[in-house]
C-alpha cells in the first residue's frame, strides 16, 4: 500500500509542490472566452527552470504529452502566458514561494515549441519553451549609440 504524500514532507532531493500549470492565450482566455486559462498540469511530463548569474532572465521548458489537442484548440502561437506557483514542501511563507502567476504580475511567456512528435492518432508530445518578461524585452529592444 502506497503511503500518502504530505505537502510538508520532502520525499526526495529536488522535491517541489506544483498546484497548477495554467496556459492562457493572448486574449487572456482558455479554450473559449468563459475560461481564464487551461490547467495543463496533468499533461506535463517534465518541467525545467533555468536561472544563472550571467543571464538577465529566467527561462525554462515544459514537456507536454498532449491528449486534448491543446495546440489546435487554444491555439499555441507563441504569444501565450504560462502561470504557476512552486513551493518546497514545508515552505509556507510568501518569501519561500516561486510565484509566476498572473496575480503576481510575473507570468512566463511561451516563445517556442520544439520536438513535436505524433505518438498516436490522438496523442502528441512536444516541448514548450518559456521565459520571463525580461528575456522578451531584451530581444525586442535595440540599443544604439547616438
Q: What do the PLM-derived regions correspond to, one by one?
A:
Residues 144-146:
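Conserved, well-structured core segments that form or line functional sites
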